[in-house]
Design a protein with these regions (language model features):
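A short helix-loop-beta-strand connector motif used in the catalytic cores of GNAT acetyltransferases and
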Residues: 43-55, 88
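Conserved GNAT-fold acetyl-CoA-binding loop/helix
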Residues: 21-43
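Conserved active-site tyrosine of GNAT-family acetyltransferases
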Residues: 138, 143
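Conserved GNAT acetyl-CoA-binding A-motif
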Residues: 108, 115-126
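Conserved acetyl-CoA pyrophosphate-binding loop and the N-cap/start of the following alpha-helix
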Residues: 98, 102-110
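Conserved beta-strand in the GNAT
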Residues: 55, 61-70, 88, 93
Length: 154
C-alpha cells in the first residue's frame, strides 16, 4: 500500500533513514556519517507543502519510502539558462529484506505521479558513483546520467 507520511510516521522514517546512512557511510565514509537526519528535519519535510515522504507498506509495516521535493532552479532568473521546475528525490530506501520485490519501482512510479500532478518537468536525484546496485536500479526505471559532479581533495 502507498500513502503519504504523517507525523506519527516520524519514528519509523527515522529508523529507515538511519539504515540508509549506515549504508551510505559504508560506501563513502568521507562524506556520510552513519546517523540519520534529525527528526525535526523529517517533521519539517512532512509538514511542508513542497515535499512529501511517499511511504510503501507491506502488511501495515513501513518497508520503504521516497522523500521528494518540488524545486525551482536557482538559475531561472538568468537568461542563459532554460527555466526549470522539477522534483528532487532526496532519498529512496527499501528495507533489505524487501528489495528486488518491486517496492522501489512502485515508489518511483508514485514519485513520478506526484511530480506530474504538480506539472513538474522532470525528476532528479543524486547517487554515489560506487553505489552500483542503486545506479543499476535507477537505470532500469528510466533515469539517465545528465551531469557529472567532480571533486578534487586538497
Amino acid at each position: 500500500m502507498l500513502r503519504l507520511a504523517i507525523l506519527d510516521d516520524i519514528e519509523e522514517i527515522y529508523k529507515l533513514n538511519t539504515e540508509l546512512f549506515i549504508v551510505l557511510n559504508s560506501l563513502r565514509e568521507d562524506i556520510y556519517n552513519p546517523i540519520a537526519f534529525p527528526k525535526i528535519f523529517i517533521k519539517s519535510m512532512i509538514e511542508s507543502l513542497n515535499s512529501d515522504y511517499i511511504i510503501v507498506e507491506d502488511d501495515d509495516k513501513i518497508v520503504g519510502y521516497a522523500l521528494i521535493e518540488e524545486r525551482v532552479s536557482p538559475y531561472n532568473d538568468y537568461e542563459g539558462f532554460v527555466e526549470d521546475h522539477y522534483a528532487f528525490i532526496y532519498e529512496l530506501v527499501v528495507l533489505p529484506e524487501y528489495r528486488n520485490k518491486g517496492y522501489g519501482k512502485v515508489l518511483i512510479d508514485e514519485a513520478t505521479k506526484w511530480a506530474k500532478e504538480r506539472k513538474l518537468e522532470s525528476i532528479e536525484l543524486n547517487v554515489l558513483n560506487n553505489n552500483y546496485s542503486a545506479r543499476a536500479f535507477y537505470d532500469r526505471v528510466g533515469f539517465e546520467e545528465y551531469q557529472i559532479k567532480l571533486r578534487r581533495k586538497i
